[in-house]
């Protein structure tokens, strides 16, 4: 039921046709950009493809294939062979009777075969009695023939039912197949001219036990049905579907290869010959569950990003990437141009390889051409790097770290405070903070020097400067006092002429610096 979709997508249905979930979705059609405010942002519902505006969901029941359905459905049946037993008796002169038995076939009738089968299954003794040889009749000196018709039932005889045309396949049929069973003709001819094959159940359709009833949500717009959310929570689009009968039941073959029987008012073409449906097994159901879980996880991440935007009242290119539609269909695209939040209607398509949307350096393909950027900004968090490469947040490459750094540094406030009821304005005619955010920093215009210190750092620097200045003043005052000492003091000190003895390393006593110097030079 899923080669590999969605749609999810896309999704599934989209290439949520399974086995290969799209690595990315990008608009193939992008409407004009219009400015919006922060509270206009919203997370897309990736579990429903907003296809052509069909967002009205209503509960309904539909029929799909059972898990374990296989292309060759086993149908139990039986063969019925008509046998005529002939007993020929001859009675001679003395009364001896000679009996000779002979058998031959006849073409049985379906009604008689059905009755014989019912006798056999019910253990009715009439079936066993019907197989006995006829009780011979005799007449003196005459030959008498007695015949008895019997129906030999052999069961089970298993055949394969083709669900597409309800034909039966078995080696017991001429050419290996039988397509003659209808309401009025409930048997098949076999390789034996006097043997017919019949299904155990008179209604062959009940042998085609491959359907199950499920509950889902129909996505519609007015009388038009665009798709539905199946029982596992995955959206399936009816775009491109065609009518196909399985076991005589009319249904729709979807683009992802699944089959459903549901009522729609739209005219749908018949599928071309040879159009088959995919196997519905536990693996396909598990893939659908995994895709749904991934889409739910991505929606939670989007809601977290949206909550962060509303809390901080700011948005970044990286956060905008969470708001991208993850499955093909109609949605929104967001971007930031010249510090203005912009929105555009978009129709998303799935991307399987990055080369599809980045064919060359600096080119982001949208539709059939390279999409222009505005100051290095595209949309949905896609930007142009400093080296000219297109940077996509979800792209796993060596540029991812560089991309993350660029995106994280691009956080700017976008929600106008006039739209925020929690904004508190200043008294008087003082400039409001939200205005200053959009103006150049006047401090940087006054001085090109910026120490980068916080407020407390500035105070520490001022205190340290004051202490250094105080120490310098004390040092200067001390020097001035020494200079202003009386000359008498200096003369008295000079006339004293005291000798200072300093012990040398050799143990001798040196009386003055001059003696120490001359002695040291002598030793050297």
Curated annotation (Swiss-Prot):
Q: What GO biological process term is on the record, naming one?
A: fusion of virus membrane with host endosome membrane
Signal sequence annotation:
1-19
Intravirion domain ranges by topology: 481-524
Q: How is it modified after translation?
A: Glycosylated and palmitoylated by host. Glycosylation is crucial for glycoprotein export at the cell surface.
State the SUPFAM superfamilies in the record: Viral glycoprotein ectodomain-like
Question: What UniProt keywords apply to this chain's record, in alphabetical order?
Answer: Disulfide bond, Glycoprotein, Lipoprotein, Membrane, Palmitate, Signal, Transmembrane, Transmembrane helix, Viral envelope protein, Virion
Any one Gene Ontology cellular component term annotated for this protein: virion membrane
Record's bilayer topology term: Single-pass type I membrane protein
**Which ranges does the record list as Virion surface topological domains?**
20-459
Name one matching Pfam family: Rhabdo_glycop_CD
Summary of the function given for this chain in its UniProt record: Attaches the virus to host cellular receptor, inducing endocytosis of the virion by using different host proteins including TFRC, GRM2 and ITGB1. In the endosome, the acidic pH induces conformational changes in the glycoprotein trimer, which trigger fusion between virus and cell membrane. There is convincing in vitro evidence that the muscular form of the nicotinic acetylcholine receptor (nAChR), the neuronal cell adhesion molecule (NCAM), and the p75 neurotrophin receptor (p75NTR) bind glycoprotein and thereby facilitate rabies virus entry into cells.
Description of how the protein assembles with itself and partners: Homotrimer. Interacts with matrix protein. Interacts with host TRFC. Interacts with host BST2; this interaction inhibits viral budding by tethering new virions to the cell surface. Interacts with ITGB1. Interacts with host GRM2.
State the protein's name: Glycoprotein
Give the species this sequence originates from.
Rabies virus (strain HEP-Flury)
């Amino acid at each position: 039921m899923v080669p590999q979709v969605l749609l999810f997508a896309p999704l599934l249905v989209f290439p949520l046709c399974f086995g290969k979930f799209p690595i990315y979705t990008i608009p193939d059609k992008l409407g004009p950009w219009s400015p919006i405010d922060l509270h206009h942002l919203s997370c897309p519902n990736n579990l429903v493809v907003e296809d052509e505006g069909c967002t009205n969901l209503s509960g309904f029941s539909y029929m799909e294939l059972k898990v374990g359905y296989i292309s060759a459905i086993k149908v139990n049946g039986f063969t019925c062979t008509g046998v005529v037993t002939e007993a020929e008796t001859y009675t001679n002169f003395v009364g001896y009777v000679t009996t000779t038995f002979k058998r031959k076939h006849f073409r049985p009738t379906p009604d008689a075969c059905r009755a014989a089968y019912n006798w056999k299954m019910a253990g009715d003794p009439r079936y066993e009695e019907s197989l006995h040889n006829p009780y011979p009749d005799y007449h003196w000196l005459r030959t008498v023939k007695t015949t008895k018709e019997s129906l030999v039932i052999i069961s089970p005889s298993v055949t394969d039912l083709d669900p597409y045309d309800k034909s039966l396949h078995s080696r017991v049929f001429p050419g290996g197949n039988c397509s003659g069973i209808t309401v009025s003709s409930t048997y098949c001819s076999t390789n034996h001219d006097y043997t017919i094959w019949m299904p155990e159940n008179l209604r062959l359709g009940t042998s085609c036990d491959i359907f199950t009833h499920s509950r889902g949500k129909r996505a519609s717009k007015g009388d038009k049905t665009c798709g539905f959310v199946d029982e596992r929570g995955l959206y399936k689009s009816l775009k491109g579907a065609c009518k196909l009968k399985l076991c005589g039941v009319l249904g729709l073959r979807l683009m992802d290869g699944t089959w459903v029987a549901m009522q729609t008012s739209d005219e749908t073409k018949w599928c071309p010959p040879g159009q088959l449906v995919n196997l519905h097994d536990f693996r396909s159901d598990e893939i659908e569950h995994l895709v749904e879980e991934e889409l739910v996880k991505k929606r939670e991440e989007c809601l977290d990003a949206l909550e962060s935007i509303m809390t901080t009242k700011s948005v970044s290119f990286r956060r905008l990437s969470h708001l991208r539609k993850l499955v093909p269909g109609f949605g929104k695209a967001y971007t930031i141009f010249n510090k203005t939040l912009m929105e555009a209607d978009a129709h998303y398509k799935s991307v399987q390889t990055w080369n599809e949307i980045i064919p060359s350096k600096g080119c982001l393909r949208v539709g059939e051409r390279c999409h222009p950027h505005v100051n290095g900004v595209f949309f949905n968090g896609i930007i142009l790097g400093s080296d000219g490469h297109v940077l996509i947040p979800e792209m796993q490459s060596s540029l991812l770290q560089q991309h993350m750094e660029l995106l994280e540094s691009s956080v700017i406030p976008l929600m106008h405070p006039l739209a925020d009821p929690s904004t508190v304005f200043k008294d008087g005619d003082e400039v409001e903070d939200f205005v200053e955010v959009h103006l150049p920093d006047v401090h940087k215009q006054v001085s090109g020097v910026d120490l980068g210190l916080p407020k407390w750092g500035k105070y520490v620097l001022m205190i340290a400067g004051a202490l250094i200045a105080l120490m310098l003043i004390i040092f200067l005052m001390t020097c001035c006092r020494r200079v202003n000492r009386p000359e008498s003091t200096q003369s008295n000190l000079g006339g004293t002429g005291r000798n200072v003895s300093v012990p040398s390393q050799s143990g001798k006593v040196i009386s003055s610096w001059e003696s120490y110097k001359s002695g040291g030079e002598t030793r050297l």
